[in-house]
Amino acid sequence: MLQIQSPPATVVSRTTIQPALLSVLNKVLSLGAEVDDERGNRTKELRNVTVTVEKPWIWNLDNLVWGKIMFRPKWADREFMKAYELQASATTRNGHPYVYGTELRAHPTLAYVGDDKDDSRVFQRGHAVDQISEYIVPKLVENLRTRRAVGFTWNVAEFSDLKATEVPCLDMIQVLARPDKSGTERLHITGVLRSNEMYSAWAADVALILELQEDIIGKVHATPGYRGPPLGCGLITTVSGSAHIYEENWEDAGHLLMNMGMG
């Protein structure tokens, strides 16, 4: 069987989240290569997929036409999304293997304590760092043009372990404050994901990043001594190393595209 050779990179840029979602679903289904993941799940996959939503605060997914689709993603339920978005401000895991807000706001540091007998370096956990309040916000207050306002969810000591079974998909964010064409200062966020299920998870990821975006803007404005201009929400961009759709969702994703006139 001849295997589809997917493009080395894919770029999608749309004004709002609905056309961005439909476009990337169409590209994964039509151009994606069939790949069995490490758990044995068959997927259609595109690598190195960049999706930009220019006005992510416009949540226009409520008017999607589902019809008789068997599986509706959880992000289609606004009550679920209200609870999911709370992840962005969480500081504890509450029994989950990871929580994005917690990994950003209570990120454990590692302290070098010496060498072991076999000359391997030994580390122990240090204090937890709130990367939002202790670093990203102060960095932006110090200089709005910084390129160093980054945060990580991937805790090396825990997740870079061959025995780890559940690890974050969203691994890094970068925040950039830049003016738009009208001169209005906007806070843009790019999220880097190692793995991104585009049908069932991508829209929820954007919503969570939007919560972070709004929180960071609020904290910058509330910082004593901030003398910069007011910030508005800007672009949200996701960069997905593996953008995929599971085989069990191929048919439903295809029906959604047809229902929306893209089939």
Positions of the model-derived regions?
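Terminal, non-catalytic protein-protein interaction segments that mediate quaternary/complex assembly
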Residues: M1-G263
